[in-house]
A protein has these predicted regions:
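Short loop/turn motifs at secondary-structure junctions
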Residues: 65-70, 122, 127, 168
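Conserved beta-strand elements of the Class I
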Residues: 3-5, 72-75, 132
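Condensing-enzyme catalytic core mediating Claisen C-C bond formation in acyl metabolism
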Residues: 1-46, 147-193
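Phosphate/pyrophosphate-binding loops at sites that engage ATP/ADP/AMP, CoA/4′-phosphopantetheine
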Residues: 56-72
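Flexible, glycine-rich active-site loops centered on histidine and acidic residues
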Residues: 124, 128-158
């Protein structure tokens, strides 16, 4: 299997508290925090998803003393990258100056766990020695800020985990409940086919 060598994270400077949301939504800090445990969320102003992911990735690499050229794979879990193509993982690979394969994983909120499972498969087949797993989103740009059932849940940020050979994680068991009635944020419409 693999072990975690280091981590990194990045949040935008702006944040919005539940009390601030209650000034324009029919809600309160108590209502939100009792149901979600969330008291505030970080929101991008000028920062991009690429900015956040790059900061988190560099932090994880620096903490482990690993150069980008030593990476064997970059996986990026995101609900919606900045581009249709290239993948968000490839954008970060270029920003870091890495030369390894890079791909996105799209599995909504559980994307990071799915990315870990993909990494576990590469480690099990002895195809990699160092894998950078990233997760990040800028959901504040997608949610309807008038819909209290969704906007109170999401913020912006990025995290990174650098994985290396070793034994720490014993197994991963994945499952899914694919009911869009549980939580649904529709894809924004465009004029393109």
């Amino acid at each position: 299997m693999f072990r975690i060598l280091s981590t990194g994270s990045a949040l935008p400077a702006l944040s919005k508290t539940n009390d601030e949301l209650s000034t324009f939504l029919d809600t309160s800090d108590e209502w939100i925090s009792q149901r979600t445990g969330i008291r505030q969320r970080s929101l991008c102003s000028d920062e991009t998803l690429t900015d956040l992911l790059t900061v988190a990735a560099r932090q994880a690499l620096e903490r482990a003393g690993v150069e980008p050229q030593q990476l064997d794979l970059i996986l990026c879990a995101t609900i919606r990258g900045e581009y249709i193509t290239p993948s968000q993982a490839c954008v970060i690979q270029q920003k870091l100056g890495a030369g390894c394969p890079a791909m996105d994983i799209s599995a909504a909120c559980t994307g990071f766990v799915y990315a870990l499972d993909v990494a576990a498969g590469y480690f099990a087949r002895k195809k990699v020695k160092k894998v950078l797993v990233l997760a990040g989103d800028t959901m504040s740009r997608l949610v309807d800020w008038n819909d209290r059932s969704t906007c109170v849940l999401f913020g912006d940020g990025a995290g990174a985990v650098l994985l290396g050979e070793g034994v720490s994680l014993q197994s991963i068991h994945l499952t899914a409940k694919g009911d869009p009635q549980l939580l649904c944020i529709p894809q924004p419409q465009s004029n393109s086919p």
